[in-house]
Amino acid sequence: MAPRRRRHTRIAGLRVVGTATLVAATTLTACSGSAAAQIDYVVDGALVTYNTNTVIGAASAGAQAFARTLTGFGYHGPDGQVVADRDFGTVSVVEGSPLILDYQISDDAVYSDGRPVTCDDLVLAWAAQSGRFPGFDAATQAGYVDIANIECTAGQKKARVSFIPDRSVVDHSQLFTATSLMPSHVIADQLHIDVTAALLSNNVSAVEQIARLWNSTWDLKPGRSHDEVRSRFPSSGPYKIESVLDDGAVVLVANDRWWGTKAITKRITVWPQGADIQDRVNNRSVDVVDVAAGSSGSLVTPDSYQRTDYPSAGIEQLIFAPQGSLAQSRTRRALALCVPRDAIARDAGVPIANSRLSPATDDALTDADGAAEARQFGRVDPAAARDALGGTPLTVRIGYGRPNARLAATIGTIADACAPAGITVSDVTVDTPGPQALRDGKIDVLLASTGGATGSGSSGSCAMDAYDLHSGNGNNLSGYANAQIDGIISALAVSADPAERARLLAEAAPVLWDEMPTLPLYRQQRTLLMSTKMYAVSRNPTRWGAGWNMDRWALAR
């Protein structure tokens, strides 16, 4: 975790990068007037919901698609750091201890349906992700759990957010950013209630109904009428949803009510990754591909395309189900002893990853996290695995987000290595998203990135991503619960001192490698493939991917 001064320096640098991409795209359109009207963009996985804050939504490719339809007080730039979005509003520090922040939404901020963006949306985001209100299927409580209260007058543009004493979250800039603020008036209109009043007064029956709609009302399904799309999926950004196609693609069009700089390209169709990417690249029917490296096999780059491979902030890992054959730590450790982590990482072209609580960055803290404890799980040891099971056979079902050639090969590698230990590993096809399949007991292990994601899955913050193993957190898919680890994760969120963070990580590592809720494999690598005629597309290691600035993209005809 970088100290605060360094983080501010990187944010300033990102503003320069953003300006450069804007100049490049503007130069194309202003000088030549030849920008294409449409771009086709392929992302990691299914687009199942507009609400990327649910467990399923956070693990999907939704953040890649909707970073510029649902804006917030910041967005994640090309290095994964949060950049202030002053088009949306401003954040000011009122007091440092306890931490008190004032959030001021732009007077011009309005949804595509004509309704104003208000502090009610902040109250809903906090309530859904704070862990205080039952029923919300939120992916994470990180940061929001430390908010003591929000002062908001319904319908107004300003909110004061007060944190619990001694809980001054270091990465508070991660809160209320792009894709985190859902339009609360959609729920208010359906229930005919004052959502903010119901939440702040903790009206139990109303909260139950609000949570139910927050979880499901923004599910993306083909066949919705134009009026329903307009009313249910309003946008607060440069793009808005026009339609959902039968094959799951989402069509975005320029939002004529957007109050900032207008989108350069008028239409972007966002496609879930399919098995036909190579064919689509060969026939030039796709302009930008933003997926996990190796997921499409040996993707050949034609002369008319350019390709960049780079590390994400997410960790590819085995996430063990809380029930079934791997419910006990003994059997999880046995499986880990026969997983060839060295060979799997080598196939991905990267070192083995060991960190669970400092996963988002490559630095000295991350490199040291769990390194000593992980040594016994670095190479295949089928004899030790067999002994750990007492010679009892074990069957393990592993699932993953399809299609993904690299993960399919990984499961095959694990199956071959574990067979001598009496462990039968099978590759299981499921008809539900990976996190749901794990919850439902359809698989014993989910092979995925941070939070069960098909893509990066990372927030870009080590402290925030560590909540994946905090009890009660939605994307704690293994159902892991350990009071000591909860305390360490909580302490990491409010500490910027490298020495203290190193101490906390060293305390956690022996516990986590003994209880084995997950098995980290390697840092997920990304492939960004684009037409040589594309302008202003840049990489991003977080779950928002290349879509973080899609309103600046331009395709030369």
From Swiss-Prot:
GO molecular function, one term: peptide transmembrane transporter activity
Any single biological process term in GO: peptide transport
Highest taxon in the source lineage: Bacteria
Keyword Signal (UniProt): yes
Compartments where found: Cell membrane
Signal peptide: 1-30
InterPro entries: SBP_5, SBP_5_dom
Pfam families on file: SBP_bac_5
GO cellular component assignments: cytosol; extracellular region; plasma membrane
Lipid-binding residues (covalent, S-diacylglycerol cysteine): C31
Membrane topology according to the record: Lipid-anchor
UniProt keyword annotation of Signal present: yes
Main location class: membrane
Residues with lipid group (N-palmitoyl cysteine): C31
Key words of the record: Cell membrane, Lipoprotein, Membrane, Palmitate, Signal
Protein family (similarity comment): To M.bovis Mb2616c and M.leprae ML0489.
Stated name of the protein: Uncharacterized lipoprotein Rv2585c
Record organism: Mycobacterium tuberculosis (strain ATCC 25618 / H37Rv)
